[in-house]
């Protein structure tokens, strides 16, 4: 498969989020009883869900989560891994990584390894969501188109792998693997000016995707050429995914490029989402404007007659976003505290669930969260609204190697639950894992409950307890 050998690539812990105790007036006694039954059937405190894991997997998870609870280890992980590689040599270092951190959080490198991971998840009632860990930030721009063209081939392979992974396949996509971050930032700056609205719109991007040699006056000749190449790459991937019935979840990234990402994603939706939501966008609820952005995009999709899919997350770039806002002197885009983020998440969650309750064919949602209260709230509202947990209109998502007590419980209860599966070589994936660990330190330090459940399960096995 194209370039598979070369590259063969997470939300938050249970904290203090609140589940609204009162039910909407519209809820009938039947829906109230169904909600209570649905919530009562789920227990995230039962370590028995780990019975399907091997003792090695339980011990490895316990050790890694314990290590991740030390901020200094996470902060200096890149330097320590670099030293380890020099001392051990490539082969021994890779062997150690595959038995530890890489093995915990990555699906594998080769096609057989990925298939083993996917098959194991399916036995546990969990669906795979493949993710290629390739992205670009400012200052990392590549010269020419070759790197982006190679990434297109890798993404097309990811579509094929996802399609072969079973029913209702999903995959993640980072636009900055196919379009430079510098161009995304430039487009985002121009999108902030209302006068550029008529020029920079989904329709104009679609026309370029379909072959029109358009050029924007605020872009140089080289930038216009790169834009044309980039959106056509994205169009080819979107159409290939739609033809293979693979849902593509476009990841959000940093606020200084997100407007451009949403513009291009809406253009992809315009091409593919007439009858079903094949292309989805991601909304980061730790941003103060996340609900208004979701509402605006819903209105745009409705005006274009499009189906709409949403990946709902809290967000992973908080520290960098706050640091940038201080450096550049603009308002902090992040919610002022954790509770505000929780309220934002629940507000967007309720909006999408209400729409799905009205028409689950045209609206889809993945509750991409490690937060137990958010998951329980979604389960409760699904029951109240009569949303069939097996219909596919609502699913749940967590990262591979994390929050397994939630994923396994949901899967065994018949809910559609996905694990985000990065895959690739140790060299290609480790930078991604290091970045995510550093960006999600608060998550990694807060997984005490999962550590306790793993410790209890390991103790049960060691002492042969029932």
From Swiss-Prot:
- Entries under InterPro entries matching the protein: FAD-linked_oxidoreductase-like, Proline_DH_dom, Proline_oxidase
The UniProt record lists the EC number as: 1.5.5.3, 1.5.5.2
GO MF terms here are: FAD binding; oxidoreductase activity, acting on the CH-NH group of donors; proline dehydrogenase activity
**Which EC class heads this enzyme's classification?**
oxidoreductase
Q: Name one Pfam family in it.
A: Pro_dh
At the top level, the lineage of the source is: Eukaryota
Flavoprotein among the record's keywords?
yes
Instruction: Show the catalytic activity.
Output: trans-4-hydroxy-L-proline + a quinone = (3R,5S)-1-pyrroline-3-hydroxy-5-carboxylate + a quinol + H(+); L-proline + a quinone = (S)-1-pyrroline-5-carboxylate + a quinol + H(+)
* Single biological process term from Gene Ontology: proline catabolic process to glutamate
What SUPFAM superfamilies has UniProt attached to this entry? FAD-linked oxidoreductase
Q: Which family does it belong to?
A: Belongs to the proline oxidase family.
Record protein name field: Hydroxyproline dehydrogenase
